[in-house]
Amino acid sequence: MGVHKLEPKDHLKPQNLEGISNEQIEPHFEAHYKGYVAKYNEIQEKLADQNFADRSKANQNYSEYRELKVEETFNYMGVVLHELYFGMLTPGGKGEPSEALKKKIEEDIGGLDACTNELKAAAMAFRGWAILGLDIFSGRLVVNGLDAHNVYNLTGLIPLIVIDTYEHAYYVDYKNKRPPYIDAFFKNINWDVVNERFEKAMKAYEALKDFIK
């Protein structure tokens, strides 16, 4: 079995954000994000070793295979979510929601203010992530929250905006005070990136909307 490996995307590392210091970004990007990349790759090596993760001993209570597959989801989603997070941040923000995105937000959530309030509420309520995404099956925009990278994920949700709510995302700047970090996050959104994600997500929905017959 081939070994799938990931490489960290250094070009996504943001700098000089408003309200989120470079000192905060440094361990977040270099230790946490790159740590998930490294552990995902290590897990792939072990899964490729048929002797290490003996499939014949797979067990729902405990087995090496089960543990590797569980941690594979945690580390892989840790990589993807962090890349989506870092990739949409730019100093002081940029642009605004496109007319198409604003119309969709109005239809599905009740407007940009309502969407912002929902995202902020999810960011306070969930321990890992708050997400605005497009449900690939219904075509609706949905605000979702995760307690960990791999806990409460909605199958088929394409993330457009992701807020990291783990304490490692804000502890250097704000200690245990999450609200000012959330406010700072919204000041640095690159709407050009979000708009592009939305356009691609809608194309994916159009291609897959009859996926479930």
From Swiss-Prot:
Its EC number is 1.15.1.1. Fe cation binds at residues 28, 82, 164, 168. InterPro entries: Fe/Mn_Superoxide_Dismutase, Mn/Fe_SOD, Mn/Fe_SOD_C, Mn/Fe_SOD_N, Mn/Fe_SOD_N_sf, SOD_C_sf. It is an enzyme of class 1 (oxidoreductase). Highly thermostable. Retains about 70% of its activity after heating for 60 minutes at 100 degrees Celsius. It catalyses: 2 superoxide + 2 H(+) = H2O2 + O2. Keywords: Iron, Metal-binding, Oxidoreductase. One of its GO terms (molecular function) is metal ion binding. Binds 1 Fe cation per subunit. It comes from the Bacteria. Its cofactor is Fe cation. It holds the Pfam family Sod_Fe_C. Homotetramer. Destroys superoxide anion radicals which are normally produced within the cells and which are toxic to biological systems. Belongs to the iron/manganese superoxide dismutase family. This is Superoxide dismutase [Fe]. It comes from Aquifex pyrophilus. The lineage of its organism: Bacteria, Pseudomonadati, Aquificota, Aquificia, Aquificales. The gene is sodB.
